[in-house]
């Protein structure tokens, strides 16, 4: 595509693991027009702890061969972010032809970026966090689920799980932030919400540390 020329795309052959030349984590897949868009976090290799400044994108049409599109967004995408670390686990969803990237900035809440293309460029429509509970650092690992009736929800949090009802514009919400009264046993972080055959499922990073995968 034209975007590949600008981003200097690289072809990545299918191997295990898929990504071998960069330190990536928190893969967030989205299927759109028969293509898997895999958004990831990116950890630099010159620090002992987390040093995460941007988000990357990989795509595949066969789940075997992958194209590296490089950096799709970064902390610099948010003018209100003054730190150079903390680009944690993101997720991108599509609605009405637009693509919304929900980005936690560790210690600064959750921001949202919008694009007309899943390849970007992603821009900040708010100029401020979508969610920021300043009394703690729980606001990480957002996931967005759109139910069959069109209502969108955003879930997030560590060690508690919260949610809000997103408005149709996907960049604002109605009502209060709700903390789940009964957090699933061993819930730690990284919620993902699904619906199948009339049942709702919450998958999450479980226990710590190391973490496993749990569901409820």
Stretch-by-stretch model annotation:
Residues 12-216:
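Carbohydrate-active catalytic/glycan-binding domains of CAZyme proteins
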């Amino acid at each position: 595509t034209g975007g590949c020329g600008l981003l200097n795309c690289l072809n990545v052959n299918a191997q295990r693991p898929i990504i071998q030349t960069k330190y990536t984590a928190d893969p967030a897949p989205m299927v759109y027009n028969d293509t898997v868009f895999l958004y990831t976090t990116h950890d630099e290799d010159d620090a002992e702890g987390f040093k995460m400044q941007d988000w990357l994108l990989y795509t595949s049409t066969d789940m075997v061969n992958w194209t590296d599109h490089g950096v799709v967004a970064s902390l610099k995408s948010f003018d209100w972010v003054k730190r150079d670390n903390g680009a944690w686990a993101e997720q991108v969803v599509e609605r009405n032809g637009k693509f919304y990237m929900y980005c936690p900035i560790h210690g600064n809440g959750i921001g949202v970026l919008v694009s007309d293309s899943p390849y970007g460029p992603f821009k900040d429509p708010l100029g401020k966090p979508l969610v920021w509970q300043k009394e703690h650092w729980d606001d990480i690992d957002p996931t967005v689920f759109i139910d069959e009736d069109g209502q969108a929800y955003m879930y997030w949090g560590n060690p508690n799980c919260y949610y809000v009802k997103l408005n149709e514009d996907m960049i604002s919400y109605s009502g209060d932030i709700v903390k789940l009264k009964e957090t699933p046993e061993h819930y730690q972080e990284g919620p993902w919400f699904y619906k199948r055959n009339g049942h709702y499922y919450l998958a999450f990073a479980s226990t710590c540390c190391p973490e496993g995968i749990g569901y409820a």
